[in-house]
Amino acid sequence: MIEIDGSFGEGGGQILRTSLTLSVITGKPFRIFNIRANRPNPGLQRQHLWAVKAMKMISNAETKGDEVGSKELIFVPHEIKGNTNIDIDVGTAGSVTLIIQTVLPAIINKNVRIRIKGGTDVPKSPTIDYIRLVYLEILRKIGIEAKLNLIKRGHYPEGGGEVIIENVNGNPSAFSLLELGKLTIIKGISHVSSLPAHIAERQMNSAREILSKLGVPIEIETDVRQGEVSKGSGIALAAIGEKSIIGADSLGERGKRAEIVGEEAARILINNLNTKASVDIHMSDMLMIFASLYGGEYIGAELTSHAYTNMEIIKKFLDIKIDVSGKRPFRFKAKIF
C-alpha cells in the first residue's frame, strides 16, 4: 500500500485529490495520514470528503477514515464502474470544479455521467467558465472530449449550483504544447446570478477596454441568470492561440466594483501572456496529471507549490520520469515520460 504524508509540501487538499485520481486509475491502494495537518481546520472537510465519496462510487472502493475531521484515510479501489450515473452534492458552496478535476481523468471512455451540486464560482478554485473555456478546450487538444452542462450557478456562501459532466471520451496520447502560437482571438463569459444585468455588462466592458491593446478580436458574452439560490458575479477569459490557450478569471464580491472584476481578469490574462508560456498558472498544475498518464511536455506560466507537490505524489503511483526546468515562482518547462 502506498503511504502518503498529507502534510508534505503545500499540505492541502490537492495531495488527496491527486492520490484519489491516480489510485482509481492505477488500481493501487493508498494510506494518507496527517491530512491537511498544517491548515487552520486540519483533517478532511466536507468538500474533500465528497471527492473521496465520488471516487469511492466510481471504483467500488473500500475505505476507512472517510469522515469529516479525519486525519487519516485508507482507500482501496476496485474496478471502475462504467455505464453508471453518479450524484454528488458537495454542500453549500463546496467547489464543483475541484471535483471535476478529480473525477474526469478517471472516467475517460467509461460512460459515466456525473451530476455535481455545490459552488460553481467560488474563491480558491477555477470558475466553471474557466473549466469550459480553457480546461476542456486544452483537453480537446490532447485528445479528450467531454460534455459539460451548466444547469445552475452557485456562489459563496449559499452555493446551489448544479453541473452535469458526461460523454468523457477520447484516445489521448503523448502531447507537446510548447507555445501558444499566434494569438487569434480572446473569448470570455461575464456572468451575474440574481443581480442586475448591468454588472455583467460593466465587467465585460472593463475587460474589453484593457484587452483591446492586444489587437485581436474580442468576443465576450454575458450570462445573466435570475432566481438562482445565490447571488454573485464573475468573468472568465480565454486567449486562444494557434497552438494553445491561456486563461484567467475573477469573481465579484461585496464592495468590489464590477469594473475592478473585469480589470482584474484582464490583467491576470495579460500577465500570463507576458510569460510566453503555453499554459496559464491554473493549467500548469492541472495538465501535469495528464502528461504523467500519457506523456507530454508543456511550458507553464508559474512553478507553484501545487506543482511541486503533485510531482512527488504522481511519482508514488507511476513509474515515470519528470523533468522540470525552471525556478519558483517563474515559468517552467515540464517534460514527463
UniProtKB/Swiss-Prot annotation:
Pfam name, any one: RTC
Main location: cytoplasm
An annotated GO BP: RNA processing
GO cellular component: cytoplasm
UniProt EC number: 6.5.1.4
SUPFAM superfamilies: EPT/RTPC-like
Record's keyword terms, sorted: ATP-binding, Cytoplasm, Ligase, Nucleotide-binding
Residues the record marks as active site: 306 (tele-amp-histidine intermediate)
Catalytic reaction list: a 3'-end 3'-phospho-ribonucleotide-RNA + ATP = a 3'-end 2',3'-cyclophospho-ribonucleotide-RNA + AMP + diphosphate
Residues holding ATP: 101, 282-285
CDD domains linked to this entry: RNA_Cyclase_Class_II
Compartments, record wording: Cytoplasm
GO molecular function: ATP binding; RNA-3'-phosphate cyclase activity
Entries under InterPro entries matching the protein: RNA3'-term_phos_cycl_insert, RNA3'_phos_cyclase_dom, RNA3'_phos_cyclase_dom_sf, RNA3'_term_phos_cyc, RNA3'_term_phos_cyc_type_1, RNA3'_term_phos_cycl-like_CS, RNA3'P_cycl/enolpyr_Trfase_a/b, RPTC_insert
PROSITE patterns cross-referenced by the UniProt entry: RTC (PS01287)
Described function: Catalyzes the conversion of 3'-phosphate to a 2',3'-cyclic phosphodiester at the end of RNA. The mechanism of action of the enzyme occurs in 3 steps: (A) adenylation of the enzyme by ATP; (B) transfer of adenylate to an RNA-N3'P to produce RNA-N3'PP5'A; (C) and attack of the adjacent 2'-hydroxyl on the 3'-phosphorus in the diester linkage to produce the cyclic end product. The biological role of this enzyme is unknown but it is likely to function in some aspects of cellular RNA processing.
PANTHER family cross-referenced by the UniProt entry: RNA 3' TERMINAL PHOSPHATE CYCLASE (PTHR11096), RNA 3'-TERMINAL PHOSPHATE CYCLASE (PTHR11096:SF0)
Assigned protein family: Belongs to the RNA 3'-terminal cyclase family. Type 1 subfamily.
Identification of the protein by name: RNA 3'-terminal phosphate cyclase
Organism encoding this protein: Saccharolobus islandicus (strain L.S.2.15 / Lassen #1) (Sulfolobus islandicus)
